[in-house]
Amino acid sequence: MRKGLRATAARCGLGLGYLLQMLVLPALALLSASGTGSAAQDDEFFHELPETFPSDPPEPLPHFLIEPEEAYIVKNKPVNLYCKASPATQIYFKCNSEWVHQKDHVVDERVDETSGLIVREVSIEISRQQVEELFGPEDYWCQCVAWSSAGTTKSRKAYVRIAYLRKTFEQEPLGKEVSLEQEVLLQCRPPEGIPVAEVEWLKNEDIIDPAEDRNFYITIDHNLIIKQARLSDTANYTCVAKNIVAKRKSTTATVIVYVNGGWSTWTEWSVCNSRCGRGYQKRTRTCTNPAPLNGGAFCEGQSVQKIACTTLCPVDGRWTSWSKWSTCGTECTHWRRRECTAPAPKNGGKDCDGLVLQSKNCTDGLCMQAAPDSDDVALYVGIVIAVTVCLAITVVVALFVYRKNHRDFESDIIDSSALNGGFQPVNIKAARQDLLAVPPDLTSAAAMYRGPVYALHDVSDKIPMTNSPILDPLPNLKIKVYNSSGAVTPQDDLAEFSSKLSPQMTQSLLENEALNLKNQSLARQTDPSCTAFGTFNSLGGHLIIPNSGVSLLIPAGAIPQGRVYEMYVTVHRKENMRPPMEDSQTLLTPVVSCGPPGALLTRPVILTLHHCADPSTEDWKIQLKNQAVQGQWEDVVVVGEENFTTPCYIQLDAEACHILTENLSTYALVGQSTTKAAAKRLKLAIFGPLCCSSLEYSIRVYCLDDTQDALKEVLQLERQMGGQLLEEPKALHFKGSIHNLRLSIHDIAHSLWKSKLLAKYQEIPFYHIWSGSQRNLHCTFTLERLSLNTVELVCKLCVRQVEGEGQIFQLNCTVSEEPTGIDLPLLDPASTITTVTGPSAFSIPLPIRQKLCSSLDAPQTRGHDWRMLAHKLNLDRYLNYFATKSSPTGVILDLWEAQNFPDGNLSMLAAVLEEMGRHETVVSLAAEGQY
């Protein structure tokens, strides 16, 4: 018998151990089942099984071809779990750490023709009752265990849950009435359910597909946003939640898009309705541009306007009385006259009819007429002949003179041509007329150019050049540039630079200024203290301009994978780079460019600027402006008026603003005071000479915007001038009350010093300070010491706004004749790092950041998601901006990184996550040793 089994096993290619397993295991299982049938005994039975048999050939561990998958029980329908493994001598299910009875398994066995290994497939059925009977915090789960001669293998756990969907929505959309082109937000939080319900929106029972109509957007937390409401968007909107159990519809929210009426243009004034005397004229307009729709407001104002008019009445002319008859003349007649002036005709009145003069015979026809004398006839004939001859001579002389003058004119033209050497006038038409310049005066030793002063690196796009090779630039031409104050500044370097440019090069530079002058070469040519640049890839990094309060955060993933950008950020200090200001507007930040412009970004970068606004009041209208390629300043967004279409988001902190943008450009923050209570912060800094060998001593009081870059510029300027800081700078709240800033000096020792100021104080006009467009604004107090032996200066300086706040400086300084080292402690010499790349630029480690994004991006029923994170970090002013991003949590963490750079307050972030119940992330932060 034993030999027969071995022979059969040998013919089938099977080991003896396998045959024993095939025979023994089922028998043992049947005995166990027929015994007690309990799961505990089954468990002991399987523990007593040997792992391998001595006669088994080497065999791999079981490999699962099919693992059990998660299942949901709908109503009372049981679910089946499937499992398939190879090679497997036995395969069983274990549910909730207990073995499933063998009789509950449906087993299918076959031999793989390719490998010759046994493939076993098993399935079990799970009922609703089994799932409901489970008590404990964990859901019902099952796991598949397979045996082979090499050992056992366990599959993954498959959870079985009872599917359901509540009937009541946690938040239903509400109807709204909105104006045309306004943003609409319809909120929806679906009912609780397992599995989590999918959400779709219906517009009049039609499914909304944002891919087809881009005016719709469905956020990650299921809210519907209509970007710009159209008339066609007037409809009934329904939120639909569905899973495998049921489908629920919310109450219908009716959105009505109304149009407020607008007036048409006024018609022309009608003619005066009165033909004579006082009347009126009128003009009309209609409320049809557009006409009010869907309950929109009717136009406010009058549809008819009337003005008084006066039409002058026509006056017909009338004759005056006849004058007296004249005396009787030689011809025996006398006359009389009258005039049409009683009244004269006017305003279209009729003229007088009849004769002005009237004559009649004054002798009743008895006057005698004498015959003409023959001598008189001869005299008359002679006079006529003489006049005729004179006229003929005059005509001949005039003709002669005319012809002579005409020949002289032609001769002049010929001579002029000869002077030109035979060349005909040439009409030069350049490609751009605005690039033609007046040829320089070659006889002059110096050319005088009146206009704005440009820095050396801006010459290529500011100095007009000519394309004509005849007008080559003069070598060593001295150009004197007159600025607005009338001072003359030699610009030898400017002339030398322009003389080295060929006309072709100049034209090429001008044609490509929009692309080339904004890139990395511009950043490298500017003042190094105002610029930071570096090379970045998809890992991101940080650009910092030291001591300026200006930085650019490039988050990881902002630059597309595989691309490398050379990026820069620079502060513009020239006044012509600043945006124009209206009366009530003021510049709150420095003008900053970041680039390269036009670079493709996949997520927002964060530009951080220091501002000087006092955000504690609500009397500001703060807006972000950017400069287009053509140099025009455009409005980007008004803080507090963001909508779905605004390209940027601004986080305004107490002293800094953070601009989230995907468009690298030139930006500035502009404030407009809505009331006189609006205030901006000024920084008052007092400087004096480092050494003074004369009797005069000058004190300079600077009134600057309270930004780091403004103070840095003055510190650098004073360092070049040999100045020193006499007192710690102080802040002053300057209100938009139109009152000037008054500066005065007090408590001078008159026995040692005297002030050369004639008045009691100096004033800086309000608008010079408020506009923020004037750099390095200051006043100078000149004191004269009575003796060179006087080396101590003690006085007080008072700076205050009329009817406003003020500051007092107590000066106590030593006047030295010997120069000493310049000490400007406000410039941190250690702040020399301008570029940080890769993970070292960020406080949050990348794995923890990814874990946070994956767990907080998905909306949670209790709200413990990215919205709560934004609320806890005080970044929830406009959540819709984050909702439109693929990872709202990632953008919020980027903004947190920019706010807390460079220290990174991870302890505060950990406390926030602890409050949100994210204990695992806090543990990870602690494990990384980050706080």
Curated annotation (Swiss-Prot):
The chain crosses the membrane at residues 381-401. The modification Phosphotyrosine is found at Y568. The record marks D415, S416 as: Cleavage. Glycans are attached at N236, N361. Disulfide bonds join C83-C144, C95-C142, C188-C239, C272-C309, C276-C313, C287-C299, C328-C362, C332-C367, C340-C352. Residues 850-929 form the Death domain. Expressed in cortical and cerebellar neurons, including cells of the external and internal granular layer and of the Purkinje cell layer (at protein level). Mainly expressed in regions of differentiating neurons. Highly expressed in brain and lung. Expressed in the cerebellum and the neurons of the hippocampus, with enrichment in neurons of the CA3 hippocampal pyramidal layer. Weakly expressed in testis, ovary, spleen, thymus and bladder. Expressed at very low level in kidney, intestine and salivary gland. Interacts with DCC (via cytoplasmic domain). Interacts (tyrosine phosphorylated form) with PTPN11. Interacts (via extracellular domain) with FLRT3 (via extracellular domain). Interacts (via Ig-like C2-type domain) with DSCAM (via extracellular domain). Interacts (via death domain) with DAPK1. Interacts (via cytoplasmic domain) with TUBB3; this interaction is decreased by NTN1/Netrin-1. Belongs to the unc-5 family. This is Netrin receptor UNC5C. The lineage of its organism: Eukaryota, Metazoa, Chordata, Craniata, Vertebrata. The gene is Unc5c.
